[in-house]
C-alpha cells in the first residue's frame, strides 16, 4: 500500500524559518541598494551630489568631455569604469545635445589659473597657455575626482587625478609645477584636501625656476589680484 501523504505543515508568519528568510531577503535588498547607490548609480549633474558623497569624499570616475577654462572642466561620470561596461558596452556621449544636463562642472582644488577674457574684460597673461595645457593634458581622458564641496557657481570642487605612463597625476599639482597657476588665494570655498603644503612647495619651486607665469617677474599679477582690479572695480 502506498504511503499516506502527510498533511502539509502550516507555518505562521512568525515562524523562525519565515523570520530568517525575511531577514535574509531584506538584508540582501538593503545591501544591493547600498551597492547601487555607491558604485553603480550615475551622477548626472550637481543635483545628484548628496551630502553623503561629499562627506565621505567618494571617488568619482569619469571622462573629461570639455575644458572651458584653465582650472575647470566638464566631467561625465562613468561609475565602475570598464568593469561596468563603460567603453565597450556603454559609451560616453560626444554630442553637445546628448551631454546637456548630464555632466558635472569640476573646479580643480587648490589652484587658480590666469583669467581669460570675459565680458569685455582683458585676458591675463598665460591664460591661453594654461587652457591649452589643460586641454592637452586631460581632454577626452578618464580621470578620478575626489569631491570636496559645491561652490557658489554649482561647480564640484575637488581633487582630480589622471593616469599617465608614469602613474597617477594630481592635475592641480601639475599645473603648479609648470607655473600655469598659483595656489588658490580665496578665503571662501578654498579646498586643498591634505595637499596645501605640497601645493605651496610646488608653487615656490616653479617661481624659483621662473616657469610659466613666473617668468613675468615683477610684472606678474596673481589671478586673485587680477580679478580684484578688473572684475570687482578696485583700482
Curated annotation (Swiss-Prot):
Residues of the active site = 107, 115, 155
Gene3D superfamilies per UniProt? 2.40.50.90
Where located? Mitochondrion; Membrane
What EC designation does it have? 3.1.-.-
Binding of Ca(2+), residues: 112
Family annotation (PROSITE patterns): TNASE_3
> Where does the protein principally reside?
mitochondrion
What GO molecular functions are on record for this protein?
endonuclease activity; metal ion binding
Q: Which InterPro entries match?
A: SNase_OB-fold_sf, Staphylococal_nuclease_OB-fold
- One annotated Gene Ontology cellular component of this protein: mitochondrion
The superkingdom of the source organism is Eukaryota
Q: Where is the TNase-like domain?
A: 58-216
Intrachain S-S bonds: none
What is the enzyme's main class? Answer: hydrolase
- Topology relative to the membrane: Single-pass membrane protein
Enumerate the UniProt keywords alphabetically: Calcium, Endonuclease, Hydrolase, Membrane, Metal-binding, Mitochondrion, Nuclease, Transmembrane, Transmembrane helix
Family designation: Belongs to the LCL3 family.
Question: What protein is this chain from?
Answer: Probable endonuclease LCL3
Native organism is Debaryomyces hansenii (strain ATCC 36239 / CBS 767 / BCRC 21394 / JCM 1990 / NBRC 0083 / IGC 2968)
Amino acid at each position: 500500500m502506498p504511503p499516506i501523504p502527510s498533511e502539509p505543515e502550516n507555518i505562521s508568519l512568525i515562524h523562525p524559518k519565515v523570520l530568517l528568510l525575511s531577514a535574509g531577503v531584506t538584508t540582501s535588498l538593503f545591501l544591493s541598494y547600498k551597492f547601487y547607490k555607491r558604485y553603480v548609480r550615475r551622477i548626472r549633474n550637481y543635483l545628484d551630489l548628496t551630502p553623503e558623497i561629499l562627506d565621505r569624499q567618494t571617488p568619482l570616475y569619469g571622462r573629461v568631455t570639455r575644458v572651458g577654462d584653465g582650472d575647470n572642466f566638464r566631467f561625465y561620470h562613468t561609475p565602475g569604469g570598464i568593469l561596468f561596461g563603460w567603453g565597450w558596452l556603454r559609451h560616453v556621449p560626444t554630442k553637445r545635445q546628448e551631454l546637456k544636463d548630464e555632466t558635472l562642472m569640476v573646479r580643480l582644488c587648490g589652484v587658480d589659473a590666469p583669467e581669460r577674457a570675459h565680458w569685455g574684460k582683458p585676458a591675463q597673461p598665460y591664460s591661453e597657455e594654461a587652457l591649452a595645457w589643460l586641454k592637452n593634458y586631460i581632454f577626452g581622458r578618464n580621470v578620478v575626482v575626489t569631491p570636496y564641496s559645491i561652490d557658489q557657481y554649482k561647480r564640484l570642487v575637488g581633487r582630480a587625478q589622471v593616469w599617465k605612463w608614469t602613474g597617477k597625476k594630481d592635475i592641480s599639482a601639475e599645473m603648479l609645477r609648470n607655473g600655469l597657476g598659483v595656489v588658490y588665494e580665496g578665503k571662501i570655498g578654498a579646498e586643498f584636501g591634505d595637499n596645501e603644503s605640497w601645493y605651496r612647495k610646488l608653487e615656490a619651486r616653479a617661481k624659483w625656476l621662473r616657469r610659466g607665469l613666473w617668468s613675468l617677474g615683477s610684472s606678474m599679477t596673481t589671478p586673485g589680484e587680477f580679478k580684484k582690479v578688473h572684475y570687482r572695480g578696485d583700482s
